[in-house]
C-alpha cells in the first residue's frame, strides 16, 4: 500500500512542486490551501505524512497540531513556515520536522 501525504499550504506553487516530488516517489498525494479544507481532508485521507503551514488564510495551522496529533499518533508531522515560530506544546519528538521556506527538493531528498 502506498504511503499518503497531505500538504496544507496556501502557496499553490509550493503545493504543486511538492505534489510532483512525492508522486515521482510513488506516494499518494493530497493538497489543500485552507485550514478548514485541510482538516476535512485529513479525516478522509488519514495521511502518513502531514505537511502543514503555520499561517493559512483561515487560521494558524500549527494551532491545530495537538488535535491532529491525537487523531494521527503514528503520522509524521512536517511544519512549514517562512519564519521559525515557537512549537506548540507537547508536539515534539522524532516524528516532527520543521521546514523553513523556501523548501528545496535536495532537502526533501534527505528525508524521503
Sequence positions of predicted segments:
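Acidic, metal-coordinating helix/loop segments flanking the phosphotransfer/catalytic sites
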Residues: 31-49
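Active-site residues of response regulator receiver
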Residues: 53
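Short amphipathic alpha-helix used as the core "switch/output" element in two-component signaling
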Residues: 62-74
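Hydrophobic/aromatic residues positioned on beta-strands within the core alpha/beta folds
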Residues: 80-81
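C-terminal output helix
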Residues: 103-112
